[in-house]
Structure formats: structure tokens, C-alpha cells
Design a protein with these regions (language model features):
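Catalytic loop of the DD-peptidase/beta-lactamase superfamily, centered on the K-T-G motif
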Residues: 2-4, 27-70, 258-406
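Solvent-exposed coil/turn segments that connect beta secondary-structure elements
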Residues: 64, 75-77, 141-142, 234
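Short, surface-exposed loop or secondary-structure junction motifs
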Residues: 130-326, 330
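Secretory targeting and sorting signals
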Residues: 1-32
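Short active-site loop at a secondary-structure junction
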Residues: 55, 78-135, 182-191, 266, ...
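Alpha-helix C-terminal capping/helix-coil junction sites
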Residues: 50, 107-108, 214
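Residue-level preference for non-acidic, small/hydrophobic
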Residues: 46, 65, 99, 103, ...
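Hydrophobic (often cysteine-bearing) scaffold residues that line and stabilize catalytic clefts
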Residues: 38, 42, 91, 95, ...
Length: 406
């Protein structure tokens, strides 16, 4: 174990860096075919995120029995408590992968047809009966993302909804005030509305709440004891990292956004979890523990997002610079950025968290944890030395995706 205290000038800015690599048993090898994780590279990413305005950042890599834990900065700016990889946090759109798992299990059970119209199960919900379940799950429905309006102004938008409680129908109604962005199936267009519809499908087909289905189908079977869906309660249970929202105005004070209902997102973004639980979840998913092989294959039918990313059914694929592809989801919710991804076989998984949002520099920096975790030292060194490494590759977040973050 290596640990060091890193001073940042004030008590509130005191930062802790801690690194722990723990083999489950002697001789456990790194995930087959992958370079060893670059711990120094991961440390550098976290340190950079703090220099760009994140109060704290952390990452956990589960590597075929060996665990790497790194953290730097604070979980609570008021007390100066150091952030740790055991802290719980809001995972934002990583929730979409949980919703997709439930729906694909329902396909396995013969209760849902991916190519059926959404209106088959929710009569009259959508104005175009050509929109299928598959198109909703792959963001090809054309349904407008209501969060573009809700959070066009970041902090005022958040404050206007942080204590509100919406129904699923309320959120769909907000979306349907706008025309669709494309014909069904014609294009990829990320929209939180799609996974609100997913939540409605889950509740209609099971007769139970989304919370109950998550718990019974995923949280309990995988022993995810740090994972919760507490909507509409505003508090994060147990020890957690506070979230800090960056205002749109340059130099504005960070806003503590920890407590909120997240009712504006629900099945699109309201899960709470930890680095360990998200690693466990995506390892289980990619190793075939949560659905049949046939449905896991359906989940990985990719729609092109850009030259290095694809979107399946509630699952992202990111193609790294070393030629390795990883699978999982990103998450943005006010005050939290999450990257949670696993290898194709699920033997290596990584979850990285910075407790801020609306900060494009931090968003891009935290993406580099994937390179360090999956590509190893040589790739990390090349990225650090390359002039292109500072280029912004993420200009959009998972909330208000129509708003460019410059």
C-alpha cells in the first residue's frame, strides 16, 4: 500500500491520494490479453481533474482478482473529508444500463418484443406508432430530450427541479411539446426521454415499480449493497461524496447539488452506487450473468455515435487508442461525472468518478482513466506527450445533450 498526503493550500483544499492494489490470491494475473493497468497514469488523471476544478476524484479497477483503488481530493468541501473509493455517489445515466438489463430480461421471459411498437404496450403514449422498443433503447426514436429545455441554464434549471417530483407521464409530455428530431430509426440522437419510456415499460409489464425490479433482478442477486434507487427521497444513504455543480458563469462558486429528488430523470438517471458495485455490475453483465447470450448479443448491436463510439441497447462501446474496446456507460448528474466500463469478457472493469459536473475539462480528463486502466503504461505515456491529448473530445453531457459545453 502506498499513500501520501497532498497539500492544496487550505484545509478545504486538502487532498488525499491513496493507491492500493490488492491481489485476491497470490499469482493472480491481469485480465487475459490486456496490458496491466497504469496506476501512475490513473493518479495523473485524478490530479489533473482536481487542477481543473473537481473537488475530488477516484477510480477503482477490478482486474481479474486484483483491485486498484486511487483517490484524490475531498468528498465534502465544508469538512475537508477526503474522498475514498468506498463513497457512494449518484451515477446519472449509468442508470440506463440497469433499465436496459431489466427490459432484456423481460425479452428473455417472453413478455417484450424489441421490434414491437412502444404503443403496443403503452397504448397512445407516443404520437408515432412506428417507434419501437429497440429504437427507444438505442436512442433512435427521435424523441426530443426534455432536459435540453430544463437545464439550458445549468444552476437555475437545477434549482427549479431539485425538490420537484414528476411522474413518468409528466416527463414524456414535456418531450412531446417538441417535434421529433428524426424519423423513427433514421438516426442516433441521445435523449433521456427514451429511458423514461423504458421505465414506463418496466412498470407496465411487471406491475411493479422500477425500484422493485432493480432490487429483485439486479441489486440483490449481485449483492450490490451500496446501490440504491431511492426516488423521490433526496438524500444519498450512508457515507457518500457530495456533488458540486459548476455554474455557467466563469469563476462562479460551486453549488452543492448533493441532495435532490432526481425525479427529472428516474429510470434514465437516478441510481446511487459505488465504484465496487458498478465494477461488479458491468463485469456480471459482460460475462453473461444477467441475461441470455442471445439478449447480450442484442444489447451489443451498435449504432454509430462517432468514429470511436457506438451505442447498443442501453450500453456504450468506446474504442480506445490502443485498439481495445470497452463496454459500459457514462453518467452525468448535477455534481457527478461517472465512467463505468468493462472489457469484453468482463474480467477487467473500471469505475471513475469526479464530484463535479458542467466542467468540460474535467469531463474529458476523466475519460482518460479508461486509457490508463485498459491500455497500460505505454499508451498513457504517448497520450501525455501527444499534443492532441489536450483536445476536447467530449462536448456534450448525458443531460441536456443538445447544449454544447465549451
Amino acid at each position: 500500500m502506498v499513500s501520501a498526503m497532498v497539500g492544496r493550500g487550505t484545509a478545504l483544499g486538502a487532498a488525499l491520494f491513496a493507491l492500493l492494489a490488492v491481489p485476491a490470491q497470490a499469482g493472480t494475473a491481469a485480465a487475459a490479453g490486456l496490458p496491466a493497468p497504469d496506476d501512475a497514469g490513473l493518479q495523473a488523471v485524478l490530479h489533473t481533474a482536481l487542477s481543473q476544478g473537481a473537488p475530488g476524484a477516484m477510480v477503482r479497477v477490478d482486474d481479474n482478482g486484483t483491485i486498484h483503488r486511487l483517490s484524490e481530493g475531498v468528498a465534502d468541501r465544508a469538512t475537508g473529508r477526503a474522498i475514498t473509493t468506498t463513497d457512494r455517489f449518484r451515477v446519472g445515466s449509468v442508470t440506463k444500463s440497469f433499465s436496459a438489463v431489466v427490459l432484456l430480461q423481460l425479452v428473455d421471459e417472453g413478455k417484450l418484443d424489441l421490434d414491437a411498437s412502444v404503443n403496443t404496450y403503452l397504448p397512445g403514449l407516443l404520437p408515432d406508432s412506428r417507434i419501437t422498443v429497440r429504437q427507444v433503447m438505442s436512442h433512435r426514436s427521435g424523441l426530443y430530450d426534455y432536459t435540453n429545455d430544463m437545464f439550458a441554464q445549468t444552476v437555475p434549471g437545477f434549482e427549479s427541479v431539485r425538490n420537484k417530483v414528476f411522474s413518468f407521464q409528466d416527463l414524456v409530455t414535456l418531450s412531446l411539446k417538441h417535434a421529433v428530431t428524426n424519423a423513427p430509426g433514421a438516426a442516433y440522437s441521445y435523449s433521456n426521454t427514451n429511458f423514461v419510456v423504458a421505465g414506463m415499460l418496466i412498470e407496465k409489464l411487471t406491475g411493479h415499480s422500477v425500484a422493485t425490479e432493480y432490487q429483485n433482478r439486479i441489486f440483490t442477486p449481485l449483492n450490490l449493497t451500496d446501490t440504491f434507487y431511492v426516488h423521490p427521497d433526496t438524500a444519498i444513504p450512508g457515507t457518500h461524496a457530495n456533488g458540486y455543480l459548476t455554474p455557467d458563469e466563469a469563476g462562479g462558486a460551486l453549488v452543492d447539488s448533493t441532495e435532490q429528488t432526481v425525479s427529472w430523470a428516474q429510470s434514465a438517471g437516478a441510481v446511487i452506487s459505488s465504484t465496487q458495485d458498478l465494477d461488479t455490475f458491468f463485469s456480471a453483465l459482460m460475462s453473461g450473468q444477467l441475461m441470455s447470450a442471445a439478449q447480450l448479443a442484442q444489447m451489443q448491436q451498435w449504432t454509430t455515435v462517432n468514429s470511436t463510439q457506438g451505442y447498443g441497447l442501453g450500453l456504450r462501446r468506446r474504442d480506445l487508442s490502443c485498439g481495445i474496446s470497452v463496454y459500459g456507460h457514462t453518467g452525468t448528474v448535477q455534481g457527478y461525472y461517472t465512467y463505468a466500463f468493462a472489457s469484453k469478457d468482463g474480467k477487467r472493469s473500471v469505475t471513475a468518478l469526479a464530484n463535479t459536473s458542467n466542467n468540460v475539462d474535467v469531463l474529458n480528463t476523466m475519460a482518460r482513466t479508461l486509457e490508463s486502466a485498459f491500455c497500460g503504461k505505454s499508451t498513457t505515456a504517448k497520450l501525455r506527450s501527444a499534443t492532441s491529448s489536450a483536445t476536447t473530445v467530449e462536448r456534450y453531457e448525458d443531460i441536456a445533450p443538445g447544449i454544447t459545453r465549451d
